[in-house]
């Protein structure tokens, strides 16, 4: 069973989406104007190992599994960590495209995003230390439908590229501190 078999997507009209996006933008603007410290968010996610290489991830009230295919010692019971990473990039792109389409008054009827990432597993398995452990290249294809000109959609792309948090995470170095505790 996949998560999609138990998930029902709420339907929303374009006008309801526009209202939500506008309200959220206004509310955040007011919070930040009142105190710039309100702009800082800390996300907390927890994970625990199960089975061969499965991870059970808890993010607030949401729980999901992460696994690997058999060739990487997994049971292929869920998407892999790098597939979730690409999924996070795709979902953030969709959110920011919606947000900036609304802000720039650019009509987007439908959005479809596809991602491909190239990963050289030699570093993962300790075969070659000179190659990168993560993706060597990622390709995103964003397909937008609607009545706008190509120039308007390129304007939207530029805004999304400049403001997408997960794209920023992939394209710029982010300090990461790892602490190991004995339990």
Question: For each of these PLM feature ranges, what is it?
Answer:
Residues 94-98:
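Aromatic- and glycine-enriched beta-alpha-beta binding-site module
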Residues 88-93:
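Alpha-helical metal-binding/catalytic segments enriched in His/Glu/Asp
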Residues 1-87, 99-183:
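Extended beta-strand/beta-hairpin segments
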């Amino acid at each position: 069973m996949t998560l999609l078999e138990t998930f029902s997507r709420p339907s929303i009209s374009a006008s309801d989406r526009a209202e939500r996006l506008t309200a959220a933008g206004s509310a955040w603007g007011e919070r930040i104007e009142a105190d710039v410290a309100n702009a800082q968010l800390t996300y907390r996610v927890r994970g625990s190992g199960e089975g061969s290489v499965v991870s059970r991830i808890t993010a607030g009230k949401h729980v999901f599994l992460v696994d690997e295919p058999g060739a990487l010692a997994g049971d292929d019971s869920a998407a892999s960590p790098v597939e979730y990473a690409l999924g996070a990039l795709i979902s953030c792109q969709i959110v920011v495209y919606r947000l900036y389409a609304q802000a720039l008054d650019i009509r987007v009827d439908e959005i479809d995003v596809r991602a491909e990432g190239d990963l050289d597993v030699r570093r993962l398995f300790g075969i070659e230390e000179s190659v990168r452990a993560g993706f060597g290249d990622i390709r995103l294809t964003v397909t937008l439908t609607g009545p706008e000109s190509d120039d308007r959609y390129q304007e939207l792309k530029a805004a999304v590229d400049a403001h997408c948090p997960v794209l920023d995470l992939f394209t710029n170095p982010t300090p990461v501190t790892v602490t190991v505790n004995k339990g």
